[in-house]
Every structure is written in C-alpha cells, then in structure tokens.
C-alpha cells in the first residue's frame, strides 16, 4: 500500500528450485483413515516444481498442484492414525518408537475452510524433514505464484504427468482441460497433432513445441495482430529490433522512473529479449520478433504488471506498530455462520498461514471436573474447542509464513480465578520465550513513549486482554469479579476490556459456566432459558480498600467505575453481543498484557491528553462508522499513536464482512474480518496483504503517520505533498476464462479514499466465447487518484450469469504502464492455472489541465526550448530589434514567468508595400498596464490586476502571415503588369511606326500631284484635305486599337486586385481570431498567477501578524493567533472573490473589445472595395488621354506620366532607335503602377 524505501530495492525473492531428492522421488506409505486404505507410493516432484505426483493403486497418476498446498506437518503436528488396523500396518505399538517422526501430513485446498489432508509415512528415516520443508517452501514461494510465463508450461506439465496404465497421454485429458469448446479442440488436434479423441499420445511425441503449436491452432489472436499493427509492423508478421526497442521504451516504460536508476532499454538488451522469446530461428538471425515471440514477451518475467519490489518485503519495518495496517481476523475459530457453525482449531492454523497477525480467542469457563477453558461463540449453538489445543496450534504456525509479531485478542469470559491462572500458565508454557511478558527496555509503558516496531518484536507473541490494575496490598491478587448483568451493554465500543462479539446471543456454551445474558430476540429467535451464575463478588469476594493504590491504578479504577455508572442497562447490544459479559482479569492474565492494553474509548480528546500509546480501543463497525463520519481527521490523528481494532457487528449472523477500506482510510490498524467468508471485503483484504512479502504488515501512507501533517480522508482535492496519480485501464482480451461455453464480462473497480473509489466499470459480455474473448472498447479512466498509496485496483471476470471466474487485486501506486497479462486468482487469492486477461494500462502522475503546458515543458525541455526559440525568430521578423531582444528574453522564461497579456507594438512599414491598397483603420493605443494608480494603490485587487486590451488591426496587419500574403500578391501583380506592359509596348511601337509611315507618305503625295498635273490649285487643296482626313481616321483607329487593349488590361488588373483584397481580408480575419484565442489562453494563465500573487501577499501579511503576536504574552498570543487565522481566512475568501469578479469583468471587457475589432474588420471591407474600385476607374478614365499623348504627341495638363508617354517622349521616327527607347522605358518603369 505504501512505504517503499527510497532508491533501488535489493530484491530478496528467490525463484523456486526443486532439490534432487524430490525430483528423484522417495518411498512413502499413503494412508487414508476414512477409506481404511494404505498404499506404498513413490512421491515425486516435476523439475519445475508445479506438481506433486504419485501412482495410485489403479496405476493412474495422481497429481496435487503445489500452489494449492497450505501447510505441511511432521512429527507430533502430523495426523496420527486412529484405526487399529492402520496403526498395526504402520507399526504403531511395536518396538519402533520413532514412528511419529516419519509421518507427514500435506494440507491442501482452495481456501482455509475447504481443506483436505493427505497422510504419508516415510519408509526411510530422515526423509520426511526434507520433503516437508521443501514442499512448504515451494508452496509459499512468491515468485512461483506471480509468474505468468509459467502458465502454459504448467498446463503442459500436468498433461505429461497424467498418463494412463500404458504410460501414454489420453487425448481425453486434453479435451477435459479445454472443455469450453470441444469442437475447436478437436479441430486443433487434427490440424496440429493428427490425433483423434479415442487415441492416446506417447509422452516423447508430445513436446512443448507441439503443445504450443496446438495452442496456436486453438487460439487465434486478433488482439496481438492489432497491437503489432499499432506498434508499426504495417502488416508484416514481425517487429524489427528498433521497433521493439521503441515499443518497450515508449509504451512499456513508466515515464515517472528516474532514467539514472532505471535507464531506458538499449539495443543490446532488446536483442537479448529476442533471443530469449523468439522461437523462429530465421527471425532471430535477422533481429526480428514474430507475433508468437511477441506474445511470449508480453507474458514474460520482464513484463509483469507489477514490479517484483511490490511483492518483496520492501517496506520499512522499523516504525511503531501504530504505523502499520495489520492483517486481522475476527472469531477466528468459526468455519461458517455465527449461530450454529462449527468451531475448529484448524482455522487458527489456516489464518496464521494466510498471513493473519491478529487472531481472536473467545474463552469461556470449563466444566467440572476437568475445568479446562474452551473457545466458542457465546450464547449460540456453535461447537467448542479446547483453549490448550488452540494455543498449541498458534505456537506451531505463528511464524511459519511471517516472522513478525502475532497479537492474541482475548475475549475473556472465564469468571474463575483458577481457570484464568490456568490460561496464563498455558500461554507461558506453550509459547515459551516467544511470549512477550515484560516490556522492552527501549519502550517502557509510559506516557508519550511510542510503540515498538514490528522489527523489534520479531518472533514475539503479544496478548490483548482486559488488564485490571489492582493495589499492591490489601486485596488478593487472584481475585476476579464478573460484571453485573445490568452492565451488559456498551455505549460506544466494547467494554473496558475492549473485546469483540459478533452475533446476537441464542444459547450458552455451557449451562453452568456462562452468564445468563441473551439478546437473541434482536434477530427474531427465541431466547434460550439459562440459569444465571453468580459472580465471585456475589459469593463474598469483595474488593479491598484502595488506600494503597498507586496514582495510575487509582485513575484507571475511577475510570472503570465511571464507565459502570454511565452504562445504560436498557440499551440493546445487538451489534456488540457478548463483550458486555466479559470478566475482569486476574493478576496472572494481567501480567501478560503490555503493548496492547484495551481500554474503553471515551473521546479522541481524552486519548490525546492521556498520550498512552500502549492503550488501544475496539469499535464495532457501526460505532466506528459513526466516529468516521463525525470526526474523520481526529480518527486519523488517534491512529497515528494508538492501535484501534474494528470488528463486524453482531447482526452479521451469516459471517459476512464490512468493507475494510472504509477504516483503512482513517488509519485503523486491526481491521478484523471473518476469514471463513470469502466475500468481496475478504477478497480485497487477501489481495492487499499479499504484498510486502506477505508479512501481514503494510506501512501506512506517510501522511497518515507524520505528526506534523493532518489528513482528511474525505478530501476531494489534491493534498499538498502527495503526488496524485492518473490511471487508464483497457481490457483487451481473455484466455481460457471458463471450462464452459458461455459469455464473459470483466469488471474494473477501484477502492481507496471516497473520492478515489469507482464502481463499477464493466465491459460488454462476449458472445458465447470463453476461450479467447476480445473486447475492443474504450478504456476505463481514473483521471485523478488523490492517494494512490492507499488505493487498490480490482479486475474481475464473470460468466454472463454472474458466476465468479477470477480476479486480481493490484496496488495502484505500483501498476506498470503498457500491455500486460494478468493471471487471475480465486476468492482466496490462490493463482488459477490458465485464466488470464490481457490489459493495457497508462499510469502517470495527475496533472491539472491548467498545468499541462508546464508538465510538457518539464517532460521534454529540449522540445520546449526549441519551440521558444522558434517563436522568438518569428517575432523578430515583425518587430524592431530592441523589441525582438526583449521578446526573446520573455520567450525564454518559464511558462509561469510569461506575461499574461499580449503586448502591442507600432507596426513597421513593409518595404514591399510602397503603395497602400486599403486605408488604415481607426488606430487605438493598447497597453498592458496595471490598473493601479496613485489613488488606487491602497486597493489590493487593483494593485495586482493588469488590464488586457485586444490587439488592433493595424498591428495584426504586420503579422507574419499578412506580410507573406502581401509579398505573394505583389509578386503576382508585378508578373501580370509585366505581361500587359510587354503587349502594350509592342502594339504601341507598331502603331507609332504606322503613323510615321503614313505621315511620310502624306507629305510626299501633294508634291507629286502638283508636278504631274500642274493644273488646278483648288484640286491640290482638295486632295490635301482628303489626305489629312484619311490620316486622322488612321490615327483614330490606331488610338482606338491601343485603347481597347489597355482597357482590357486595366479591367484584368482591377479584377486581380479585388481578388487580392478579399484574400487579404479573409487572412486578416483568421489572424484576428487566432490572436483572440491566444489572448484568452494567456488571460487564463494570468488569472492563475494573479491569484497566486494575491495569496502570497495575504500569507505574507498573516506571517507578519503572527510574528508580532508571538512577542506578546502567552494567553494573549493564543487568542490573537486564533483571531489572525480567522481574519486571514475571511480576508482570503473575500479577496479571492473580489479578484475573481474583477477578472470576470476584465474578461468581458476584452471580449467586447475583440468584438469591436471584428466589427471594424467587417465594416472596413466594403470601404476598401469601393476605394479600390474608384482608384481603378480613375486610372481607366485617364487611358484615352495617355494614349493620344503617346501616339499623337498631344500635351494636356493633368495627364499621367504613364509608360506610353515615356515611349512617345523618346521619339519613334528614328526607327530602331525608337525600339531601343521602348525597351529602356520598359526596364525603367516596370515597377510603376498603371
């Protein structure tokens, strides 16, 4: 749950090994008293340590799964035969007196109640000890029970061992193992092995490779294919070395791991994995991993869902006892219900072997003549077991699976001083030095002294029993008084002995030894008539005077008297049952009590003032729930120093359990459950205590142990100092989930703090497929786990009718990321042979949405710095050199240091934009200045709040995107202008040449006519007029021809410029919207920074006030400190509320300003279009005059200096010279607008 030591843990777990003696086998006589049978067998163990097997009388091999073995016993702890015939055959009663040393009993079963006993007697001496120790060591091996890579090998081994009389493997055994779909099995057998149902297989022909080939035919794996495709196999049936290495480092690696302590996988290590798991030599030679090898890797030891450190003893065991959750049992002796169940000594063995470190003993007075105290459930019809047998069983098994201390929780109803003395003597003689009687020197029983640690108490047994502090003289030490019947009810928990009942009272353990108290009517059953037995006090043993009683004894005596006076005799005790009838302890039993002294709980404040860590209290679950609801933080504080025990209420007559997580959440250590009932609470308890080496002790989270920290288990926010987790679980597929052809569904639950608990995520039900169902569904998200070290994840599979298949409990803080196989367990947390689930998990630290940018910058700082540099370069192209330098410094700051508002700057004229194509919009002068002024500096909110204004259009026109667009549009217009200019100049040259030629011909024609005719002057004049008229018409045609070309070109250019204008406006709108989005994001960051700054100012103010208050007198200081804290809270709440209101108003102002910018953009567009249209129209109207001036040499005021005028001014009468001039004009004027 918590408490892993810092740094890299040195793994202490060892893999299972089978010694040669067990592999070779030994001769034993197997006897069964019920069947009156005895057979000589040879016990063997397979080389992997999976199965114990022997050949029975019918020549068939019997097997026993090693993981089902719960204990092995030899000597006097082994079962002895009672049948005279079997005893005679085994040699009992003969000369050999060492026969007991040859006996061995193997206890096996799926849970602590349903156990079987296999009895053996060794033929040879010194054989039993080796077999017993090695079998128990293999059965308890933690690595063997957490090895998914051995699942298929184990199934293969079982088939190989179960041969028939001919020494062959029956095919029916294969069909039985995979009975969920026999048709698929038969098809796979035919395709893979060529055997039919009625045949058998020679063991040497049934290799592991053939078995795996059969499984590949039996199980199609579309889930693995999909994973390979997602990794990057791209339809190929293999992964390359680089792909495998990337997959492991990116998908399978926890990003939270330190790269120095846990470096990423290197190529050489990835190659070793391929060599280990790839069965195909061709792929192996090419450093490739096939689908089969990839599936093997997913189930390999390197890819466990949990690190081995979580399974190993990795927690600090040197903290006080109160710092641990302790595996605890209630009514340990019962095997079934609370009313008529069977009591069993074996249950104490099984509970302790299961890791329980606190067992309960309900002891009652024995009957004459033996007067042997016994254990039973008082006032019910449950059976009895002798106390001595129970203590011997505890002594035998207390430290077989865990060396850490065991607590014996006595509920003492023995109202006989003689029998209590016998109880104490049994404890001393049976436990010997293991029984802790005197407190340790380092940990005296004094106020303020913490409890010793589990490490200090290794191998010790502690007694929890009512301890009566008696005066040293004046009263016989052996006196014992039973409580009167009218004091039979307790108001809060158990009586001053803090003992625990469990059920309503129906009968009596003995008609002459138990108090006649019964509240069986609470459960509707008839009360049994009993004769009340008088207490020793009524018989004349009165208390002596306490004038010589020490202060502590007097104080405790007064407390007990107070309890008796305040008890309500009429209040029913249905929940608390027999605790009220417990008797006072004698000196003999009191002497055995030290660090676990039960006292009646009064209040948390009273316990804090007493400050006695060795005192503890017990709470029935209903009273504990009341305290948990009313005072959760005080409950946590109490459990930091003292022990508390929670036990089920008495109305749970079916031995059901409450959910232990409720009380773990407040740090209760001894959360006792009914171990015989494997319901969900007990399953959770068994799963949780599997970790930390199954020691029975789990270190509580640090926040629940530190005296300087307070913890609220009902918190819904992240606790300062605790790293919350985020977890995502996707159930992909299952394998061999049931032996029936049914649908399967999977539930995923989380147990932890109330805010962390989630129930129930559930997949859909597969359609009649329990072999290999595939669930392609969305993952289950646990976005925020506030206290991951106290949270557990449960993944459970069920058949469609709700029948339990298997489950697994995983500590959230230790779950690894990636794809993993999860082998399922039964209700008692024992591993199942084949059922498994393939899941995908993502485990990470929880990061609030507001801090995602910071987290990304920390995770990938190189990428973050590169992005900042890139942004700085982009800004440098838009703003001046000095501002660029300042912006670069700003971008290189951490995200928490950046300004929240976007600063505006004056736009820099674009050198390419020497003729503006749209008028500038209304310009504002935004600033990011503080709202505070000299008159407002006293206003705390105004001094913190900064104003943010929208960026104006003029500044956004200088955006890089706009500059780039204008550059492209200018280039486009220049190209179009060049094209038109070339056509116009060429036509102008031709027209000028034609005019020059016509002019020359016109001058010569009148002279020739005069010479030839010389007749009439009038005719000559008339002819000149006609020539002049024709020349003018020629001129007009020339002008019109050039005018039509230029007007068409002007219209094309106008259309292109209008198109550019629309593009520019659209792009400007996108820039505006992007700027607004960025501004809102930065405004959100600015809000958080302003809140933090406000809180810092308030905290500083509070600290200053506290420093001043500490200088005052003590009584004034406390009052003033209280007032300072109250004022600080009020001022903080009000100030943050005012700041949030001001921030909201600022947000609204910014939104309104941004809307004005957008409206300005919308209103501006038609004006720009009209202006551009007018400008183009004016240029088009000037074209006729330009052309006439160019062609005819006319001059007129107001004519533009167009290219045609330049052509005309250079003169074209010189022919080629005119052409050269036209070319020069083109090169000189190509950048001038028409």
UniProtKB/Swiss-Prot annotation:
Function according to Swiss-Prot or TrEMBL: Catalyzes the production of the second messenger molecules diacylglycerol (DAG) and inositol 1,4,5-trisphosphate (IP3). Key transducer of G protein-coupled receptor signaling: activated by G(q)/G(11) G alpha proteins downstream of G protein-coupled receptors activation. In neutrophils, participates in a phospholipase C-activating N-formyl peptide-activated GPCR (G protein-coupled receptor) signaling pathway by promoting RASGRP4 activation by DAG, to promote neutrophil functional responses.
The gene coding this protein: Plcb3
Stated name of the protein: 1-phosphatidylinositol 4,5-bisphosphate phosphodiesterase beta-3
Residue span, C2 domain: 706-834
Provenance organism: Rattus norvegicus (Rat)
Disulfide bonds: none
Residue list for modification N-acetylalanine: 2
Cellular compartments annotated: Cytoplasm; Membrane; Nucleus
PROSITE patterns with a match to the protein in the record: C2, PIPLC_X_DOMAIN, PIPLC_Y_DOMAIN
Family matches, as InterPro entries: C2_dom, C2_domain_sf, EF-hand-dom_pair, PI-PLC_fam, PLC-beta, PLC-beta_C, PLC-beta_C_sf, PLC-beta_PH
Self-association state and partner proteins as the record states: Interacts with LPAR2. Interacts with SHANK2.
